[in-house]
Amino acid sequence: MNKKMTDYVIDLVEVLNKQQKQVFWGIFDAASMISSIIVSYILFYGLINPAPVDYVIYTSLTFLFYQIMIGFWGLNASISRYSKITDFMKIFIGVSVSSVLSYLLCYAFLPLFSVRFIVLFILLSTFLILLPRITWQLIYSRRKKSDGEGEHRRTFLIGAGDGGALFMNSYQHPTSDLELVGILDNDEKKKGQKLGGIPVLGSYDQLPELAKRHQIEKVIVAIPSLDPSEYERILKMCNQLGLKCYKMPKIESVVQGLHPQVGGFQKIDITDLLGRKEIQLDESRLGPEITGKTILVTGAGGSIGSEICRQVSRFNPERVVLLGHGENSIYLIYHELIRSFQGIDYVPVIADIQDYDRLLQVFEQYQPAIVYHAAAHKHVPMMERNPKEAFKNNILGTYNVAKAVDAAKVPKMVMISTDKAVNPPNVMGATKRVAELIVTGFNQRSQSTYCAVRFGNVLGSRGSVIPVFERQIAEGGPVTVTDFRMTRYFMTIPEASRLVIHAGAYAKDGEVFILDMGKPVKIYDLAKKMVLLSGRTENEIPIVEVGIRPGEKLYEELLVSTELVDNQVMDKIFVGKVNVMPLEVINQKIEEFRALQGSELKQAIIGFANETTHIH
């Protein structure tokens, strides 16, 4: 078979789904057993009668038992590029045990055939079943090598615990480009032991010495619970030694389908190096809030809005209304969700939050139980140049959403705010501060419950500092930092989205919720870690200070003193009481803002927002 033909066959089978692969291999295995019984009969007796009933029954029983056994082992959809020697042994055992069981069952009521006949049948069946799998593996391996993927990399695995065992069990197969040389673990008791036949050579503190001795090229970290500071230390050692460093994905991301397999690995990213572990919150109260209900998310196509949609979908709502102004982003999240979750009615709605009548029509039509308001303009320098748009979207848009919630009798609204709303020097933060006042104002007069959630900087969101640094590093630098003293609070997109959903569950009376994000992080330190992650040095990728941009602060705050309350609703979540202003006063201010433009509008909004920070 020439190369083009083998490539065609491989590509053809690779596109089959799991059920189709089960049928494919099931038919092939059945044909192998039928061929084996025929060949065995001819070899023993020199002829074959037309369809002897005892042999038909025997072969059918053997195939049935065999399918049950390999199904139990998870091999009935096995494509051999993932097969291991242990899989081949299981196939041999499956054929042998199935044949013997069938023989014993047939012993009582069918003419017997000799034990030698059974042995020959077992050997022939095993050979014919394994032949295409091994051939497939060799062809696939050859194609990988011809594509430049087949070179084996001498590799250390860090972690001989549960994570290491999972990795070894799911990844170690003959076509891998890894040559696992040894395992490193800081548990002295494990030194000298073996995991999957690979020895534990010592602790990962010995990485420099052992890597040179064994000519290592790659390191894979398989300790899901490893402290971020330890990740950073390992990464620094790898960079100094010129080694590529990877990690296992988190187990929950594998379970949720966000990563293809436990044994896959990915580069360590900046979220591992923020100095704290990702916060997990108690989800026991979330099911009753969401399950079987209609949820509406504004800004559903954005970074936070789309993640809120994913998170609420885990709790099986009846319907999720995806409301957004950008048709492309709504299209993408809609199709992602209908692929990922079954039994949920996803409704894509193109609407502008500046259009109150349209919002009211949507809210009355779908009657959501909760509205998560994530639509907003968020970029500080951009809004400094466009204050009117910040006013229209963040203030008028929020007012329209809150008013429609009240008019449509939606039980609950959760608004996404920002730590930049505290003592804001810029128009973006000021508009979000006014938006907080709007929702707390409505909370005072409406039957609906309103609350706000303040975020720090969200890693990985569109326009955040991480993709900017990545682009600058990819271009060879320099990496630009506005001020080496600048600090920010950081959280991941899943953390931010979970906080929003928890706020909806705990909201009672116009609270503002803030996640405990640990200590603020210096942007300069973040830039240095990003350069480190790239495998480069600061000599190769310089980091330069360019000066604070209009509207930026050196330090962000989470709460002011007048917003503090004594209790926390739950561990890792602070709750504050936003100072309330009557809606009549807010309405009057909004009308004043409508008449202003440019710098006058900007100063008016900033001035009003700061005046309201310390009201009682």
Describe the function of each predicted region:
Residues 241, 256-257, 373, 377-436, ...:
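Conserved Rossmann-fold NAD(P)-dependent oxidoreductase catalytic core, especially the SDR/UDP-sugar
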Residues 2-8, 231-294:
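Flexible, Lys/Arg-rich cytosolic regulatory linkers and terminal tails that connect or flank
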Residues 1-150, 240, 247, 371:
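Signature of alpha-helical transmembrane segments in polytopic membrane proteins
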Residues 21, 280, 285-289, 441-457, ...:
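Strand-loop microenvironment adjacent to phosphate/nucleotide-handling motifs in alpha/beta enzyme folds
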Residues 350-370:
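Conserved Rossmann-fold cofactor-binding substructure of NAD(P)-dependent oxidoreductases
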Residues 211, 215-216, 317-318, 363, ...:
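Proline-aspartate-enriched helix->loop->beta-strand connector
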Residues 45-49, 139-255, 328-332, 339, ...:
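A solvent-exposed beta-alpha-beta segment
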Residues 295-313:
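N-terminal Rossmann NAD(P)H-binding glycine-rich loop of SDR-like oxidoreductase domains
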